[in-house]
């Protein structure tokens, strides 16, 4: 939320009806799971609702970002071609941005990635590879919005977890960690547990 009319750039999370009336220059497709079928009823209906963001709200010749090899790649490429969007992918060595290595140092991670074939790194305390992937989405979106890479790297390390999203809220005397996440569907719970086990294999 902001009342500052001087704001030139803003990053917001897509949500039903929240974006009506906006024109977007850059849009990200992070994933599609079975979390909201109570509202959308069918997986196809859910996908079509998500694609409204790219079909109607994303400006022609705007930027579209998604992960290389996702099952919705065909639909996104079709929209990109129709609207003459600039497509940027995250994932493999041929992608615009690519995660190369996650180096674990106690509770901290050193994230090594390449952008336009040039190597960079930053620190993060976020839990799980899914959050690291989301950080790379944020890095790329900021870069495409004209933010200098030095500024991005200086600030991305300060990003804290969203409340209730793989959030460490405590540490016990036996060094066990208390991690809070509001996942409540089978897909979401599976993702959360697998991401926790990535960082803490004994959990």
PLM feature spans:
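Single conserved hydrophobic/aromatic residue that forms the stacking wall/gate
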Residues: 1-12
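Short, conserved loop/helix-junction motifs that constitute active-site signature segments
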Residues: 20-23, 53-61, 80-83, 199-201
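Flexible beta-alpha connector loops of hexameric P-loop NTPases
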Residues: 35-40
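Active-site-adjacent loops and short helices of periplasmic peptidoglycan-processing enzymes
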Residues: 46
């Amino acid at each position: 939320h902001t009342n500052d009319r001087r704001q030139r750039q803003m990053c917001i999370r897509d949500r039903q009806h929240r974006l009506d009336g906006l024109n977007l220059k850059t849009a990200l497709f992070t994933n599609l799971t079975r979390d909201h079928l109570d509202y959308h009823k069918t997986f196809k209906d859910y996908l079509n609702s998500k694609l409204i963001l790219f079909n109607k709200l994303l400006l022609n010749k705007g930027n579209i970002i998604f992960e290389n090899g996702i099952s919705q790649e065909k639909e996104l490429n079709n929209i990109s071609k129709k609207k003459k969007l600039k497509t940027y992918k995250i994932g493999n060595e041929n992608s615009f941005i690519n995660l190369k290595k996650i180096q674990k140092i106690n509770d901290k991670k050193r994230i090594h990635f390449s952008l336009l074939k040039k190597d960079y790194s930053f620190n993060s305390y976020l839990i799980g590879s899914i959050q690291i992937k989301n950080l790379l989405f944020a890095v790329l979106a900021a870069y495409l919005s004209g933010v200098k890479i030095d500024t991005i790297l200086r600030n991305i390390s300060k990003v804290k977890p969203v409340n209730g999203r793989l959030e460490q809220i405590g540490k016990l005397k036996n060094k066990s960690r208390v991690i809070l996440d509001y996942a409540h569907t089978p897909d979401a719970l599976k993702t959360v547990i697998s991401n926790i086990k990535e960082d803490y294999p004994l959990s």
